[in-house]
Amino acid sequence: MIRLASVGDAAELERLNAEFNGKGKTTEESIRASLLTNRCEIVIVADGNGGRLAGFVCVQLKKSFCYDEYMPEITEVYVRPEYRGRGVAREMLIFAQEYCKKIYPLHSFELLTGSDNTAAQKLYSAIGFECDGEMHMSKQVK
């Protein structure tokens, strides 16, 4: 089942995030706090077997005075290896889009992915995402 994450998912989300981004990037407590207080992020999860989660999607809700609409950006997509190839990521992404369309005024979705992640890019293209000519840049701040 695809659904919004709840505070009760914090421990399992910590395990998933450790698989995805590496151990020590966050804690169960910080995830719980974020799920309770972060109104700029929507977290979608897919239920797996035995009380475990199969994956998650994070959507950041960007809003600027320059535009009337929200600009949601999908920033994280992770599916455990044993659930890959079953349409779990596709289902979570579609759920995220449909949920956001119901709640927020918007006309587009943005998505951030690695330039070398061709498998993910293929999925994103298949559900209607396309390169928009924008370039994502970052800078380390010490």
State the predicted function of each range.
Residues S138-K142:
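Short beta-strand-to-coil "C-cap" segments at the C-terminal boundary of structured domains/repeats
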Residues A5, V77-V79, T113:
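Hydrophobic adenine-recognition pocket in adenosine-nucleotide-binding enzymes
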Residues K101-T113:
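Conserved GNAT acetyl-CoA-binding A-motif
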